[in-house]
C-alpha cells in the first residue's frame, strides 16, 4: 500500500511539472505574438521575421531601389514611437536624421548587422528572438533559410559552378561564399577603381556578381566581354513571411540560369 502511494504521488508531481512547463512555453509564445515590431527597411524586416516576429511593418517602402536613402517623415517617427520594438541596421539615412531623438522614444531599439551569411542570420535572429521571446518560432524559420542556402550550394556544385572564378560585389560576397563559389576578388560598394578594372581585364574571371541596389559592374564587361554577369539583391521586394529566403532563392536561381557557353549574359533575380 505504501509503495502504491509513493508511485501515485510521483505521477501527480510529474503531471504538475509537465503542465507548468507547457504553460510557461505557451505564455512565452503568446507574449511574442502580441508585440508590435517595426523595421527600418525590408531587409531588417526580413531579419525580424527570422527572429520570430509576425506582422512586421516597415518605414522605407520595399519598392525602393536603395531603401537606406529613404527620408523619414514625422508620421514615420510617430509610428516608431507607438511600436514595442524598432529594428534597424544603423547605416540608414533615417537614423542620421533622427539623431539622438531615436533614443528618447518609448520603443525598444534593436540594432542588427545585415548580411545574408548563414552565420550572421543565425546570430541576428537569435538576438531578435531573445528580445521578443520568440525563440519557439525563430528556430524553424532559420532552419528553412539554411536549407535554401544549403540546397543552393549543392545545385552550384552539381553544375560545376563552384570551380569557376568569381568577381563579386562586396555586398553580395557573404551569400556567394556560403554557396561555395570561388570568390577571387571583390569590388564596390564605391565606384570601380582603375586597378579593379585592370584586374578583370587580365582575364580568368568566369562570373561577376553585381548588386541591384547600386550596380557598378558595367565597365568590367567592356574589358572582359565573355564573363557572365548576374545581379543579386539584398533588400526583399516584399515584406512577408519568409521574405529573405524567397529573395535568396531568386538570387540562386539567377546564378544557376547563367549560360555556361561563351555568350555573355546579364541576369537579374
PLM feature spans:
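Acidic/His-rich segments in extracytoplasmic proteins that coordinate ligands and/or metal ions
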Residues: 23, 55-134, 217-228
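Short, low-complexity disordered leader/linker segments with a strong preference
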Residues: 1-34, 267-269
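Basic- and aromatic-lined ligand-binding clefts that recognize polyanionic substrates
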Residues: 33-40, 44-48, 137-188, 192-200
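Alpha-helical, coiled-coil/dimerization segments enriched in small aliphatic residues
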Residues: 51-76, 172-199, 233-241
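Structured C-terminal subdomain patch of bacterial secreted/periplasmic proteins
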Residues: 35-36, 119-122, 126, 130, ...
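N-terminal glycine-rich anion-binding loop in soluble enzyme alpha/beta folds
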Residues: 28, 34-67
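Extracytoplasmic ligand-binding site segments that recognize negatively charged/polar headgroups
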Residues: 95, 99, 107-135, 161-178, ...
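Periplasmic-binding protein-like
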Residues: 85-90, 139, 206-212
